[in-house]
Amino acid sequence: MHGLVLFALTLLRFIPLEGETCHVQGIAVDGGRLWVTSVDRTARKGWLFEYELETGRRLRAAEVQQGEMVHPGGFDHDGESLWIPVAEYRPGGKTVIQRRSKATLELMSSFEAPDHIGALAVLPEGLLGANWDARQFHFFSLDGKLLWSRANPQPARYQDMKRRYGAIVAAGLLGRGADARAVVDWLDPETFMLLSRETLGRTDRGVPFTNEGMDLRDGLLYLLPEDAPSRLFVFRVEY
């Protein structure tokens, strides 16, 4: 659906998430469940958490780090799998892209990528990754072949992105520090040119709403901007 224009967001509620979430990264929402990736920088561990969406109750947790690759990022899912990038904690570092079962969180398969993949979206034809600060896009086949790489024409630093409504929906920041603006961008999936942009504010803790995880499902925008105690913000989207 090229040319989609987002014209209104209404905050419906926020859901406190149970337990220590460390430094949150990406989210995925489906079937009454919420999945969250997170990194414990002190212990050098990566985490995948599963929650009951309605209540924020934690259901399961799995460690995802592999060697020096401890930093999971923004991620996505298909019908039965979660596709999660877990990278070395530095620009240009290697990444292992893991395919994990939504039913059990167990690792099903994986492949390595020669760059730090900080966000990953599942497309019908493969996997779209964005590197550190989203300066480049990389496209992989589902069996791990790097098919192409190209520069991101947008200045935003995307943390999480999904293929929704025929576009790439990417959430992140424009600018840095106190001047950073929270944005959700709709990108053309072939050219990555901007179709639409919605600018959001900050939480009552002063954190930009798109600081970390994002998903868009059934007319609802889900944002997880804050580390522990983490809150999932739910917005109604009106087109």
Q: What feature does the model see in each segment?
A:
Residues 11-18, 57-65, 106-111, 145-151, ...:
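A short beta-strand motif characteristic of beta-propeller blades
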Residues 15-46, 71-74:
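Beta-strand-rich domains and repeat architectures in extracellular enzymes and scaffolds
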Residues 21-28, 67-76, 113-124, 154-164, ...:
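Repeated scaffold domains used in trafficking and secretory/extracellular systems
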Residues 39-41, 87-89, 132-134, 173-176, ...:
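Short loop/turn segments immediately following the C-termini of beta-strands
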Residues 43-49, 91-98, 135-140, 177-186, ...:
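Structural motif
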Residues 52-56, 100-105, 141-145, 188-192, ...:
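Short loop/turn segments that connect beta-strands within beta-propeller blades
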Residues 56-86:
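Blade-loop segments of beta-propeller domains
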Residues 153-189:
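Loop/turn-rich, solvent-exposed surfaces of beta-rich toroidal or solenoidal domains
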